[in-house]
């Protein structure tokens, strides 16, 4: 179990998948991300895309803090069940949960005309995801993101430096113990 830290649903508990399939983002890190995006005004009314959603905690934290809508993408069936449960418990209707491999789902979103739709994109891929696969995912995000969109990637602190695809511009990287939050922004 984990909880939402701030905003409308602050203090509400969320289920997390059992086992080691997912690695829920720590409350401290979700709070830091939420605070950073709120401070820049990026969350108010934002459309959020949460890639590798796991329990949905990261995206739901942002929804709680002022985002207007959330699309959560996850491929693991147990995690999908958990994120759907968490959405149901919070009684939010502005959430769409999509099942499947992230790269495949991004292509489907682009094909259905979801271009320039998302104001904030968060990605918490498995720490073992090859850099080439992450680069492919980030490149696929570009046509789906709105001008000025924030893109935030959670990575292990031992990961190679993140290479942002053009035109995403690196803003900063913050370290929290064994975790890095890498912030980028589209022009």
List the predicted regions and their residue ranges.
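Class I S-adenosyl-L-methionine-dependent methyltransferase catalytic core
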Residues: 1-187
């Amino acid at each position: 179990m984990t909880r939402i830290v701030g905003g409308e649903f602050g203090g509400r508990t969320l289920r997390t998948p059992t086992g080691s399939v997912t690695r829920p983002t720590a409350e401290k890190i979700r709070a830091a991300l939420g605070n950073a995006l709120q401070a820049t005004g990026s969350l108010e009314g934002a459309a959020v895309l949460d890639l590798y959603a796991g329990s949905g905690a990261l995206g739901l934290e942002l929804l709680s803090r002022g985002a207007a809508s959330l699309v959560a993408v996850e491929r693991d069936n147990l995690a999908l069940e958990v994120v759907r449960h968490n959405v149901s418990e919070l009684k939010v209707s502005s959430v769409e949960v999509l099942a499947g491999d992230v790269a495949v789902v991004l292509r489907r979103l682009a094909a259905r005309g979801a271009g320039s739709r998302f104001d904030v994109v968060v990605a918490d891929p498995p720490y073992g995801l090859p850099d080439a696969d992450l680069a492919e995912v980030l490149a696929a995000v570009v046509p789906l993101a709105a001008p000025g969109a924030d893109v935030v990637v959670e990575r292990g602190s031992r990961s190679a430096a993140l290479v942002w695809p053009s035109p995403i511009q690196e803003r900063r990287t913050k370290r929290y113990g064994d975790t890095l939050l890498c912030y980028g922004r589209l022009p």
